Amino acid sequence: MPDSDNDSGGPSNYAGGELSSPREQDRFLPIANVSRIMKKALPANAKISKDAKETVQECVSEFISFITGEASDKCQREKRKTINGDDLLWAMTTLGFEDYVDPLKHYLHKFREIEGERAAASTTGAGTSAASTTPPQQQHTANAAGGYAGYAAPGAGPGGMMMMMGQPMYGSPPPPPQQQQQQHHHMAMGGRGGFGHHPGGGGGGSSSSSGHGRQNRGA
């Protein structure tokens, strides 16, 4: 048979040289994968014939079916639907392939460790992403509750009861700017009207001026 690198998963020969059916071919590993694995064990300039590839293809496919079938029987007896790695290792031991068990146990252990780390990292990343996407409105409300708890609503009277964040509060807020201007104006007027006022006296500067005026008119 001529040498060929055809990796299309060509037909395998069965009883009397008859070609296998398409359904029979479905249970084989892709011949391209088989060829790639075989080449890793050979020198760079080595070649593999087509019949060698097909022989190994059939061999490894049969081995997989053999081990998987034994593990499947175990799962059926235990009324389980999922075959796991431990079931396959048990099947290899039962069928006499103990030499494969120890290295595969080590591989299975490392594989599960890596998967666990990936799951933990994914969970942590999801939590961080959720925290970073907190709506700005909630953050503003939290800041207002913490930093402006003593602020009173405009228009609340002195000593009056105010509501802030749903809680009653008491206090005298600073008057609005307009009210401050009015108070300042009244204070200025009062200061001018009371000029000349003496402690204990009943009259002010304006009263004295009025008296002098009346005297002048009488004269």
UniProtKB/Swiss-Prot annotation:
Pfam family, one: CBFD_NFYB_HMF
Gly residues bias: start-end ranges: 190-206
InterPro entries assigned to the protein according to its UniProt record, in alphabetical order: CBFA_NFYB_domain, Histone-fold, Transc_fact_NFYB/HAP3, Transcrpt_fac_NFYB/HAP3_CS
DNA-binding region(s) in UniProt: 29-35
Transmembrane segments: none
Name of the gene this protein is made from: NFYB8
Taxonomic source organism: Oryza sativa subsp. japonica (Rice)
Regions of compositional bias (Low complexity) in chain numbering: 119-134
Family, similarity comment: Belongs to the NFYB/HAP3 subunit family.
Alphabetical UniProt keywords: Cytoplasm, DNA-binding, Transcription, Transcription regulation
Subunit structure: Heterotrimeric transcription factor composed of three components, NF-YA, NF-YB and NF-YC. NF-YB and NF-YC must interact and dimerize for NF-YA association and DNA binding. Interacts with NFYC2, NFYC4 and NFYC6.
Annotated function: Component of the NF-Y/HAP transcription factor complex.
Protein name: Nuclear transcription factor Y subunit B-8
Region called Subunit association domain (SAD), residue ranges: 56-67
SUPFAM superfamilies tied to this protein: Histone-fold
Renumbered residue ranges of the record's region Disordered: 1-26, 119-142, 166-219
